[in-house]
Amino acid sequence: AVLPDSPAEPLPIAARLVKLRAMRGLMMDSPLLISSLLRHAARVYADQTLVSRTVEGPIHRTSYRELHERSQRLAQALLALGVRPGDRVATLAWNGYRHVETYFAVSGIGAVCHTLNPRLFFDQLLYILQHAEDVLLLVDLTFLPLAEKLAPRCPGLRGVVVMTDRAHLPEHALPGLHVYEELLAAQPGGYAWPSFDEHTASSLCYTSGTTGDPKGVLYTHRSTVLHSFAISLPDVFSLSERETVLPVVPMFHVNAWGLPYAAALTGTRLVLPGARLDGESLYRLFEDERVTMTAGVPTVWMGLLAYLKQTGQRFTTLKRVVIGGSAAPEAMIRAFQDDYGVEVLHAWGMTETSPLGTACRLTPAMQTWPEDQQLAVQRKQGRPVFGVELRIVDDEGRELPHDGAAAGDLQVRGPWIASGYYKLDGSNAHHDGWFSTGDVSTIDPLGYMQITDRSKDVIKSGGEWISSIALENLAVGVPGIAEAAVIAAAHPKWTERPLLLLVKAPGAEVDARAVLDHIAQHVARWWVPDAAVFVDGLPHTATGKISKLQLRERFKDYRLPDTE
């Protein structure tokens, strides 16, 4: 804005802000709260349906009106259990209607909804629960055995709620266990959602701990509502009450990429797949519920495409598939678009970006380009959505040109980008107000970003991160192993799998199987490397670090045993 008395030389930002504050607009100061999304859905889209494949088995159908009423009862139940504003309430659950109710009820009372990723190994989950100081844990039936192991080791946990009814409750070893449906039935309903500062913490997700302990990212009501608006835009997910969306991405993965919130905002019909994510189960749900859009990681789509190829089935209603979590292979894009007539939307984000940062849609001019040129664009992660700014910088922090050739550290900022980590002061991931993603990227003149490498050498297998450092540390803990390095090897299904490279100590007698068995005792099964190879030595940089760059080049054509 230019003020009438502006000097010839621009004022410093602080001085300009002081002048701009001299005149305030006359708009109501209504806070952007997550409860307002659900209240809006219940009033405007009351009869829109939400469909869930439940853990118990049957398909469950509800409406936004009923979802709102049950969320109000859950809010009252949480308060009756002693949950207070600011408390963290954890979930271990699949995509289902009770999990959606928990999203809205926990945040709606001013507490923090903390989704736990059950695919992490036990020690990580225990660390996260203890670090977050969760006061309550809500679990699907699937994860009740896991909760029985975790709860006794978390003294701050006041109780566990099983998200089922009494008829489906199995035998268990947890004292004072609460049954979800009984908690709701005991409440009168009609809860009035409180109003509070929109900057209040609303939800908490932890990173996968690829460079050490997992780190907590604490979202706010404001950031969540703004993110919901952004992902609903026509050139992003294009959500409306005319769409039926099935989020395959789990609700424990950065809030299912924000889709449950955005669906309430736009009245989108939501279909939730539960625990069954195989190709046949997903296809049947797509067809039975006439799904028009879906979102998930490449590994899931590989299984779905394989099922379609084997059976000759085709989609009758699916129009768009969002692929994120890791890069979409060109063959996958071609298969969806050429073989099945489904548009592919390539997207990028991370836990720290809520998660959506970019979406890749072709411009009108690109629609006339040759197919190969269009695919070259679609392989990119796309352009930033409104609210997100991107830049790339060199090692000295100098901004690099957006010419599609210069590659540098990708940095991002915006209203739903993390400014720090929960209980972690002095994060070195932020530079002059920008968050460093750890990705090496290019940005072309049209604003399309493409990730070319990952600076921290993590392995992304089926959309899940695996820490090379953690595996290396375990390997060198085996007697007789002098040095170890883990790099990514290409895999046709999982995109990447860990390959373990080992150097024996002089005179040592140790076999690869013993090393892998040792690792398997300490990490989740899917973290265990697919192969271990002994080498005479590992290359090092001038500073004494193992050169992963040289190792990747040396083993770029390596074929894992089960992919021969």
Task: Give the ranges of each region predicted by the language model.
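AMP-dependent adenylate-forming
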Residues: L37-T62, H168
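AMP-binding/adenylate-forming catalytic core of the ANL superfamily
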Residues: L120, L126, L137-L141, T294, ...
